[in-house]
Amino acid sequence: MKFFVALALFACLGSLALAKDDEYCQNTVITACSTSAFSANSICNARFAGIDHIEPEIQSYINANLAKSYDYLLLATHFNSYQKNRPGFQKLYQGLSDRSFEDSIALIKQVTRRGGIVDFNTRHESSGSVSTKRGTLEVDELHSLALALDTEKQLATGATHVHSRATHATDAERDPELAHYFEENFLGKQAESVRKLSGYANDLAKLMKVPDPSLSVYLFDEYLQKQ
């Protein structure tokens, strides 16, 4: 009788040990490495904390930055034409385009560093999603600043949303590393961009309150070239 009790206890402990094996890389690494490549569901990866919860939000934000980068590039091209000939505005929007593109590359590196895979066909809608709808970009100088300001506010709101999800989620979904990354690389920078563009828009609006604002716009463009 004692033999059967001991055998049952041994079998129970063995099943518990096997159940725990799937939770740690050290218990499955030999099996995983015996194949040609780690499977997508392997525990031997760089994913930890709340990356599963936040990855779709970051993916959406990457797509938004890429879309806005091309919008800014179109604005820069518009003001670089011989008809408009506004090199100051061209410089401003070219800089914003380059920054958004570089932010996309940095985010792609961050996602892959954390064990994620970037899929540009993924569409994730949330309260922090940035609109990628493209409106009319052939606008005058003042309206272009208003358009850029709206875009920067959208990007800032999107970054704030990702940071909030990484910070205020449940214990299993919280990700302090990603929250710190967004705080260090996006929130302060985008707050400064919103402040700068809002100042530009207000200054130019005041300068244009004259019967013929062409000289005011020309001087403002000269100012932008020096920034």
UniProtKB/Swiss-Prot annotation:
Tissue specificity as recorded in UniProt: Expressed in hemolymph, gut, ovaries and to a lesser extent in testes (at protein level). Expressed in the head (at protein level).
Cellular localisation: Golgi apparatus; Secreted
GO biological process: detoxification of iron ion; intracellular iron ion homeostasis; iron ion import across plasma membrane; response to fungus
Any Pfam family: Ferritin
Disulfide bridges in this chain: 25-44
GO CC aspect terms: cytoplasm; endomembrane system; extracellular region; ferritin complex; Golgi apparatus
Domain Ferritin-like diiron: 48-208
Induction description: Up-regulated by iron-supplemented diet in the anterior part of the gut of third instar larvae and adults (at protein level).
Alphabetized GO MF terms: ferric iron binding; ferrous iron binding; ferroxidase activity
Gene3D superfamilies (UniProt xref): 1.20.1260.10
Signal peptide residues on this chain, from the entry's feature table: 1-19
Gene ablation phenotype (knockout): Embryonic lethal with some embryos displaying cuticle and nervous system defects. RNAi-mediated knockdown is lethal at the late pupal stage. Also the levels of ferritin heavy chain Fer1HCH are reduced. RNAi-mediated knockdown in the midgut causes growth delays and reduces survival rate only in the presence of the iron chelator BPS. Also, results in gut iron accumulation and systemic iron deficiency, reduces Mvl transcription and aconitase activity. RNAi-mediated knockdown in the eye does not affect eye morphology; however, the eyes develop degenerative vacuoles.
UniProt similarity note: Belongs to the ferritin family.
Subunit note: Oligomer of 12 light (L) chains and 12 heavy (H) chains; L and H chains are disulfide-linked. The functional molecule forms a roughly spherical shell with a diameter of 12 nm and contains a central cavity into which the insoluble ferric iron core is deposited.
Protein name: Ferritin light chain
Gene source species: Drosophila melanogaster (Fruit fly)
